[in-house]
Amino acid sequence: MSNATPMVRQYQELKAQHPGTLLFFRLGDFYELFFDDAVTGARELQITLTARHKERGDPIPMCGVPHHSAANYIAKLVRKGYRVAICEQTESPSKAKKLVRREVVRIVTPGTPIDPQLLEPRESVYLAAVCAQGETVGAAFLDISTGEFRATQSSGRDAWERIVADIESYAPRELIFPQALSALVRAGFRNEQKTGTLPLARDGMSDNLQIVDEGNMATTDDKLKFVGLPFTLTALDDWLWQTEDCAALLIKQFGVRSLDGYGLTNKHEAVRAAGACLRYAQETQRAAAAHIGDIVYFEPQDQLILDQITVRNLELVEAMGGASRSLLDVIDETVTGMGARLLRSWLLRPSIRRGEIEARHGAVAELYASHIKRDHLRSLLKEVADVERLTGRLNLGSATPRDLVALRRSLDQVPSIRDLLANGESSLLQVLNDAADELADVRALIANAIEDDPPAKVIDGGVIRAGHSTELDELRSLSRDAKQMI
């Protein structure tokens, strides 16, 4: 468009850097979509499609949503399989010399959600990765909202089938894989509901990643579905899966010298899958994701593999036909989202290690035998927020002041929980008690710095307690008493 305004050119440049996404472009109090993105957004969100620059005879399709409710619109698009690039104004309009600087600060994909609108409190949301070399297949599973990170590897003629069963058991929202593996992946998951591609390519000027345009959303030729939940297929450029680069990325993330302590020695395909998973998460979040602090390697024989047909027929997590309740519905008496997600994972991926099973039974038996201790423990846990996801939002820079207060109130329960479990006989309860850190310094810092009832957003002010920061107190005084001082 030769006569494009500076703002439109800025949009086009950012869009060119992030093809394969719908670009939410911040303009004042709205996020705007232009050109083909606007047509798609208006159709999928059922909002009005209008046009910009009609008077010039070359109208630009556009639609928009208010920034304060954008999360709900983004959630609708991501649930449909779209990927959304969020572009923010990164300088104040009053300070901008000409055009306000804007940058893409995050890409929301089906497998990397952190916003509450895209998360179920009692279910994990996994990004999965799969790769293969010969008869060895590796896979990794990452819940970026909590930092849970797992990897596995299988070898032999039936390795692919075993890994596919693992992937089905995790029910990821998104599966990434090397482009070279596209035919095998699409054949293996041809019964699913929707697919998509978001390949990343190396920028010729740097080591940053660029998204290669293969469309905003998938075609519907292939079908992807597990227990009623569709997931998206995402092909990534093959260079992202180099073993040495993936290992180096994981080592840097975990702050270690080698991956031997994680059971990943000579597990090259597991390392490749995990490294690609981590890189994809970091690139979409535009953050280091420091809450992803370790990884658990598991052997296929460590757990019972239940394929999707078995899970459905046994009604483990979803009832069939006229049944009103699944097995999970019947037994789930957990009082925290963290406990609910753990119970669900135990049902879908049962351990077959005798020691682990007996330890769980011992802990349950002890609490079952003492209803006083059990009821007291449940009352304490009811005061605990979803600390896993709270810390995830903190590390990804999306936490609110109220999240900090919720974290402090949750940590306030830890000393009482430890006291309650201190004299337990169960080996598992003892291990949990010994591992629990009361984080007294963190609790004290939040209590001293943050108001008990802060506003929802930092920008609203009134978050930091008076007296915590001398500099802030002086600035508040200047703001409050400016007229008198003048």
List PLM regions with ranges.
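Charged catalytic and DNA/RNA-contacting regions of genome-maintenance
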Residues: 1-366, 379-382, 386-395, 399-485
